[in-house]
């Protein structure tokens, strides 16, 4: 049996009791670690689970899934995913390949950012399409996701923005030379995402277009959702450029306007104090 | 401290390890039981948690929250919610009231139908606004949610339909006479939801309007998501009228059209066999 097990969002104890029981009895336990991170590392998980974990990076899962499936028809193998196995990233490719090999599978769900974002008080059923904001480079500055934000807002829907993660990336030179040397991991902060968004707003204005959002649009920054030191800050997009949310992972919500009174009241619990609004400007 | 703890979707062991530790040390533990149900009852939860649970029905939470908050500033109180505390139903009203009383709170997240629905293979970020389908009566047959389905489909988005639950409802006579006698609980099935949807489609046609969906629209019925005996069936809306999914809870997804190839492939794992498509017709 192949078990796909969600780990939730915080630390080792956010696994479900059912998930933990499976992890402890499986013959091999893989940890997917390229789409998200927990606030604790692999070692803390290993200690709490009492099991060695095999790191499954992108290459492993995409190219060498055969290793994962080995003997999974006669023994139990677990594949651990931060959040839910079908949350922000879907692992349906693994399930499809297992099914073709005649290996049965079971999913053990958990919280993912897709539902835990509700902790800021915005109602989940008022969220439209989720978007991803990637790190810009000097030559690659995609803006296409902005159309989705625009469409969501036109329909009065909030937009959850998932922020880029670069884990186990090679520099161009190392890639060309075939050297398996990896850059330090990078995680986009709410500040960076807000700055890129403001550039897009300005680009729209420069082209004479009315941007879908402005510096004053109400946003919510979230950091380490589900962890002990979770931080939530509600304020304008401009404020999101300088608000201090600490360590990764960060997410950003662009509200859809016309908030429900209960949504407004919840967001007021997280509003950025006036004194902070010019920090670092 | 007030703890809001998600129980997940299946049985007693779907609580997180962190949640279980909190439940076992709290002075009082409430179980919210009017917006959803687990496949196991209160007794099974009590046995596994080793704690007595106080059922918190709608009246209790809306009118007598003071009981829940009693001494929560000096001791720990847990409020258990099937799924996630901010999933299909938000409990932000409890948090706002606690905050006003100076009671700190903490949320322990879990899977909810809002993210676990991803197990059918449809990608979560392609879901638009979630709708609720309520039981029709002879005199109350609301169709207004259908506009949201239409808007979602126009944008290529899937629609998660949450199906009505009637728990602890009084008959009109008992309500008038002030008798606290409750009707047996009722849970809408995928069959019933599909039949109501088909009536709406026919009403639109009768008014000369083009309905947003037809008998042939691809839908997904889900039952007891996260439980051992979970069932998923993909087929036309017409097939959803007769597909056999067993006990509650049921949910229905109306696809947005233009499925991603990976979505199609996943749905094919759950397609209703031809031979079943005329069952009961």
Swiss-Prot record, chains A, B:
Which keywords does this chain's UniProt record carry? Methyltransferase, Phosphoprotein, S-adenosyl-L-methionine, Transferase
UniProt xrefs under InterPro entries: 4pyrrol_Mease, 4pyrrol_Methylase_sf, 4pyrrole_Mease_sub1, 4pyrrole_Mease_sub2, Dphthn_synthase
Q: What is the effect of changing residue 260 to R?
A: Most homozygous embryos are non-viable and show craniofacial, ophthalmologic, cardiac, visceral, and hemopoietic abnormalities
MF terms in GO? diphthine methyl ester synthase activity; diphthine synthase activity
What reaction(s) does this enzyme catalyze?
2-[(3S)-amino-3-carboxypropyl]-L-histidyl-[translation elongation factor 2] + 4 S-adenosyl-L-methionine = diphthine methyl ester-[translation elongation factor 2] + 4 S-adenosyl-L-homocysteine + 3 H(+)
Q: Which Gene3D superfamilies match?
A: Cobalt-precorrin-4 Transmethylase, Domain 1, Methyltransferase, Cobalt-precorrin-4 Transmethylase, Domain 2
Q: In which pathway does it act?
A: Protein modification; peptidyl-diphthamide biosynthesis
Kindly give the Pfam families that the UniProt entry links to this protein: TP_methylase
Signal peptide (UniProt feature, chain positions): none
Q: List the disulfide bonds.
A: none
Q: Which residues carry this modification: Phosphoserine?
A: 171
Query: Binding residues for S-adenosyl-L-methionine, per the UniProt record?
Result: 9, 84, 87, 112-113, 163, 225, 250
Family, per the entry? Belongs to the diphthine synthase family.
What is the designated name of this protein?
A: Diphthine methyl ester synthase
What organism is listed for this UniProt entry? Mus musculus
